[in-house]
Each structure stands twice: as C-alpha cells, then as structure tokens.
A protein has these predicted regions:
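Ubiquitin-like/PB1-type beta-grasp interaction modules and other compact soluble beta-rich domains
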Residues: 1-77
C-alpha cells in the first residue's frame, strides 16, 4: 500500500533522566538540542552521566538512551 503524502513517520524516542525525572525525548539530540527541546534558553551547566559537558561541546555531544543529565540553568540578577 503506498504511503500518503501527508503522513510522517513518528520520530524515534529514547528514555533518559533529567534532574532525577524520567523523560522520553527525540532520538538524535545533542545536549544543546535537548536544552532547546526543554525550552531552556541562555546559559546552562550540564552534567551527563556525572561528567560536566563544556559549553563549547554541547552542540556536538549526543544524548543517548539511558543517559542521566543534571541541568542547572544560570540566570543573572542583582
């Protein structure tokens, strides 16, 4: 049976833990992509499996099934 043009395949999802909470997110996200997916803008410190991910590497480090991430969103103030 041919596919309909308006139907799309669902995006595969993976199970991870973010700040102690289980989540399912799209497969193939980088750490930066995960931050965007979660709606976190600006600076954020991210630890992946107990290892800090430098900000310069957040766009290249992939989030993988079973990862445990701790995210601290940095905000300014006075």
């Amino acid at each position: 049976m041919p596919r309909r043009a308006n139907m799309t395949e669902p995006t595969p999802r993976i199970a991870i833990v973010v700040n102690g909470e289980p989540r399912e997110v799209p497969h193939g996200l980088t750490v930066r992509g995960l931050l965007e997916h979660l709606g976190i803008a600006g600076l954020a410190a991210v630890e992946r499996n107990r290892v800090l991910v430098p900000r310069a590497q957040q766009g290249s480090v992939l989030v993988e099934r079973g990862d445990a991430l701790e995210i601290v969103h940095l905000v300014g103030g006075g």
